[in-house]
UniProtKB/Swiss-Prot annotation:
Protein name stated in the entry: Forkhead box protein M1
Domain of life: Eukaryota
Keywords of the record: Activator, Cell cycle, DNA damage, DNA repair, DNA-binding, Isopeptide bond, Nucleus, Phosphoprotein, Transcription, Transcription regulation, Ubl conjugation
Modified residues (Phosphothreonine): 608, 624
Residue numbers carrying Phosphoserine: 329, 374, 521, 727, 736
UniProt keyword Transferase, yes or no: no
SMART domains reported in the protein's UniProt record: FH
Gene name as annotated: Foxm1
Compositionally skewed regions (Polar residues) per UniProt: 604-613
Start-end of Low complexity biased regions: 43-54, 110-124, 140-149
UniProt-annotated stretches for the region Disordered: 1-54, 95-167, 323-348, 500-560, 577-635, 660-709
Length: 760
């Protein structure tokens, strides 16, 4: 302890009695100076009892919710008009009061109040995030657990600053006397401390030193012999200037190297007693570096002299630069010129001291404890309170989606893949694993073109033996119409979806080839289906890259349709019967072998095997496909039976999403919208049941898809207040609400034009 002079000093300072009487007025005064528009903190913050009881005296709009996954963590939703400093103080007192048994980590998020304009809560949210940034930046190494930030007015004397520090600590919480809590180190300054018996002489020396510096700044004329008489202070001149002083002090304006050393040591005692011997190397370096110093040799060639080149010699002497002046006389021009040309480092140091000491909060220290960086923390609120959080526009949807998908992939075995939407009106489609068959004429003439039918959605339900034989005898070729004829209702999302989702498995579609393939016998189909299902279960466990690189099927299947259109059942019944064995459309490989890759739907977007998507009502199908009793189900994601009703979709968009994550229904009310967890339409981890029936969007309304993308991924910024290690971190929160009573996030109340530029 004795070898380190600072540690006993700091320990002694730490145990000083801290005056609290002026703390409330100081705090409110400084708060008024910092931001006159914000409400002043209550004077009752100065006492610990009020701070402890303020945990139940939060403003009306604050809601505290237990975090569903992290223990001892609570989420605090703060309205935009609340006083953040008093809330942080109350939360700190609450965390200190509960200790390790109760909640000691709080996530602060901003929630907008009731507003008639949709853009106004967004302004509140951005203002709150800016205020949170101000708090984190102002605190520096002293986190928010110690209470409010205490910026100092520039003219505050040291004693007032010490009292304001003490007031901030007393208002925040009870002082922690533990030696492991070193957050208060950043608040210590070298002056303005109370009496200390152990290190009294050291503090007096520091204070005298500061007073000397202030005198030198304010009265340069009275500084005549301070540094010259002082051994411990380095002279404020460069080596080049001191060499000029030494050479010009002689009559012949020349001097040997040894004489230069001697002259500097005589006139500047610092170099003789304090400085390390390396300063002589600096002298030699400057002599050889600058061209103004010329080396001359004596007549006999034994002695070398250093002189100054006549054209560069300004005849500077120490008497010109450093001359004792009378206390009221003006300074000489040489003195002013030298002071301007060679700035005094002592003066600069004093100026910085005078600016930094009053502004103690601006002093930056490297944090001694590790700090938590920004991260995404998924939160699902299992409550029925009407809690409105403003989504942050600062976080792009694509970045958050990629971060969230990587987080899910890292923590679970079931990988959720983002839904991929087919591009329209450009003729560019992802490369299918099996090329689509062609159709030369519509099956039902006069009813229009056949929509794009997925192969696995064609179910064989009831086929008469006569029709079976007739269709086996004459195969029919099916041609998918060109992509230009099928407009997409999400044309506004075309560019960003193509940028974010077509990187993995997208390339121009090659020309489909014609091929012929017949249906096998039922027993052969059942055996092939079982073999293929086992093989596909093994292949699902592999990576997507290996599936993508697998060679496609050599022969393409043809589609067979019955002549009557009476066999149609809803997709929910077909999904319920998907576990029964049934004949299946198969593609023989090398004359009869089972195929390796499952038959994809028409124009698949990825190489991941997928199950059939939802079918449509008879009016939009224009013909009834023969539904088979059961089909291969390769999807790693199980769709809940009866989760969705039939989606009226006459544009064929739902059949083009072939990833395991189905393009779910687009909701009309926020309860249905918020019941769906981001990237998980199939399961609700908190047990909220899915809606029994959900209406789909009307065709040609692209705005209804943007709420489903952005409101499901409502990202907001928050702060994490950890009262155990006194840290305040800024995080991004991924929030979804399963149980909202009101309808604040509906499409009518939210201006979705704020989210469209961020998506692009």
């Amino acid at each position: 302890m004795r070898t380190s002079p600072r540690r006993p000093l700091i320990l002694k300072r730490r145990r000083l009695p801290l005056p609290v009487q002026n703390a409330p007025s100081e705090t409110s005064e400084e708060e008024a100076k910092r931001s006159p528009a914000q409400p002043e903190p209550a004077p009752a913050q100065a006492s610990q009892e009020v701070a402890e009881s303020s945990s139940c005296k939060f403003p009306a709009g604050i809601k505290i919710i237990n975090h569903p996954t992290t223990p001892n963590t609570q989420v605090v939703a703060i309205p935009s008009n609340a006083d953040i400093q008093s809330i942080i103080t109350a939360l700190t007192a609450k965390g200190k009061e509960s200790g390790t048994s109760g909640p000691n980590r709080f996530i602060l998020i901003s929630s907008g109040g009731p507003s008639s304009h949709p853009s106004q809560p967004q302004a509140h949210s951005s203002r709150d995030s800016k205020r949170a940034e101000v708090i984190t930046e102002t605190l520096g190494p002293k986190p928010a657990a110690k209470g409010v930030p205490v910026p100092k007015p520039p003219g505050a004397p040291p004693r007032q600053r010490q009292e304001s520090y003490a007031g901030g600590e007393a208002a925040g919480c009870t002082l922690d006397n533990s030696l492991t809590n070193i957050q208060w180190l950043g608040k210590m300054s070298s002056d303005g401390l109370g009496p200390c018996s152990v290190k009294q002489e050291l503090e007096e020396k520091e204070n005298c030193h500061l007073e000397q510096n202030r005198v030198k700044v304010e009265e340069p004329s009275g500084v005549s012999t301070s540094w010259q008489d002082s051994v411990s202070e380095r002279p404020p001149y460069s080596y080049m200037a001191m060499i000029q002083f030494a050479i010009n002090s002689t009559e012949r304006k020349r001097m040997t190297l040894k004489d230069i050393y001697t002259w500097i040591e005589d006139h500047f005692p610092y170099f003789k007693h304090i400085a390390k011997p390396g300063w002589k190397n600096s002298i030699r370096h400057n002599l050889s570096l600058h061209d103004m110093f010329v080396r001359e040799t004596s007549a006999n060639g034994k002695v070398s002299f250093w002189t100054i080149h006549p054209s560069a010699n300004r005849h500077l002497t120490l008497d010109q630069v450093f001359k004792p002046l009378e206390p009221g006389s003006p300074q000489s021009p040489e003195h002013l010129e030298s002071q301007q040309k060679r700035p005094n480092p002592e003066l600069h140091r004093n100026v910085t001291i005078k600016t930094e000491i009053p502004l103690g909060a601006r002093r930056k220290m490297k944090p001694l404890l590790p700090r938590v960086s920004s991260y995404l923390e998924p939160i699902q609120f299992p409550v029925n309170q009407s809690l409105v959080l403003q989504p942050s526009v600062k976080v792009p949807f694509r970045l958050a989606a990629s971060l969230m998908s990587s987080e899910l992939a890292r923590h679970s075995k079931r990988v959720r893949i983002a839904p991929k939407v087919l591009l329209s009106s450009e003729g560019i489609a992802p490369l299918p694993a099996t090329e689509p068959p062609k159709e030369e004429k519509p099956l039902l003439g006069g009813e229009g073109l056949l929509p794009l039918l997925p192969i696995q959605s064609i179910k064989e339900e009831e086929m008469q033996p006569e029709e079976d034989i007739a269709h086996l005898e004459r195969p029919i070729k099916v041609e998918s119409p060109p992509l230009e004829e099928w407009p997409s209702p999400c044309a506004s999302l075309k560019e960003e979806l193509s940028n974010s989702w077509e990187d993995s498995s997208c390339s121009p579609t090659p020309k489909p080839k014609k091929s012929y393939c017949g249906l096998k016998s039922p027993t052969r189909c059942v055996s092939e289906m079982l073999v293929t299902k086992r093989r596909e279960k093994r292949e699902v466990s592999r990576s997507r890259r290996k599936q993508h690189l697998q060679p496609p099927c050599l022969d393409e299947p043809d589609l067979f349709f019955p002549e009557d259109s009476s066999t149609f059942r809803p997709a929910v019944e077909l999904l319920a019967e998907s576990s029964e064995p049934a004949p299946h459309l198969s593609c023989p490989q090398e004359e009869g072998g089972p195929f390796k890759t499952p038959i994809k739907e028409t124009l698949p977007v990825s190489s991941t095997p997928s199950k059939s998507v939802l079918s449509r009502d008879p009016e939009s199908w224009r013909l009834t496909p023969p539904a088979k009793v059961g089909g291969l189900d390769f999807s790693p994601v199980r769709t809940p039976q009866g989760a969705f009703g039939l989606l009226p979709d006459s544009l064929g968009l739902m059949e083009l999403n072939t990833t395991p994550l189905k393009s779910g229904p687009l909701f009309d009310s926020p309860r249905e919208l918020l019941n769906s967890e981001p990237f998980d339409l199939a399961s609700d981890p908190f047990g909220s049941p899915p809606p029994p029936h959900v209406e789909g969007p009307k065709p040609g309304s692209p705005e209804l898809q943007i709420p489903s993308l952005s409101a499901n991924r409502s990202l907001t910024e928050g702060l994490v207040l950890d009262t155990m290690n006194d840290s305040l971190s800024k995080i991004l929160l991924d929030i979804s609400f399963p149980g909202l009573e009101e309808d604040p996030l509906g499409p009518d109340n939210i201006n979705w034009s704020q989210f469209i530029p961020e998506l692009r």
